[in-house]
Amino acid sequence: MATQRISDEPAYVLHRHDWSESSLILEVFTRHHGRIALVAKGVKRPSSSFRPILLPLQLLHVAFGGDAEIRILKAAEWQGGHVMPTGDALMSGLYLNELLLTLLARDDPHTRLFDVYTQVVQVIASGHGEVLQSALRAFELLLLREIGLLPLLDAQTMTLLALDPESRYSLVPEGGLRQTNDADRASLSGAQWVALQQSLVDSAPFTATLRACSEVMTQLKPQLRALLNYHCGVQTLRTRQMMIDLQSLSL
């Protein structure tokens, strides 16, 4: 059987680790092939043309070949656009990468999610800190919806009853969306949940969901954190714990 070769494929490096003295294994998120593993041979040599560009949060066009689970990187070209983020922006990007590594199966294409990820990376690189948190929440919602882990947000999950605009509801990992009391500070009104659901199916879902998230940031964040930790099988994601540790050191 002929070896398949893919060329000019939009991609981001999610993670990299040593494979040999001169080579790396890359976990890459591609637009048309989903998350894949590539071996970058000789990339650690000073003369390698790949060495300065195989970085996270940078849009690449790659070529690769092979029929095994781990393919071989043949070419990579940086597409430009922005410099490497630093500080909180960099940690936010690495957090997104950890979510993709944990929740996406290999060789499962998600073209819409790739496009959303590209938009979030642009927000991260822009240095607009005031919208960064809303962008992260929007990506979390769109990721969960894309992979089938987010219940409908315009109905109670267990009963499928429509939400009352004035009542309060919480999103819980094992029960979905359910009614709660007014004293629950992490809850949202029915009208707010419906607005989030409508944003997810908008023709421009990232922009619409970012806008909707900005209105409910304080209440939404802990609910999404609990849901993501549940599906990732951890109490705290590694990058989130690193951010907590760094913040404590700066106090």
Curated annotation (Swiss-Prot):
The keyword DNA damage applies. GO terms for biological process: DNA recombination; double-strand break repair. One of its GO terms (cellular component) is bacterial nucleoid. It comes from the Bacteria. Keywords: DNA damage, DNA recombination, DNA repair. The keyword Transcription does not apply. It holds the Pfam family RecO_N. Involved in DNA repair and RecF pathway recombination. Belongs to the RecO family. This is DNA repair protein RecO. It comes from Albidiferax ferrireducens (strain ATCC BAA-621 / DSM 15236 / T118).
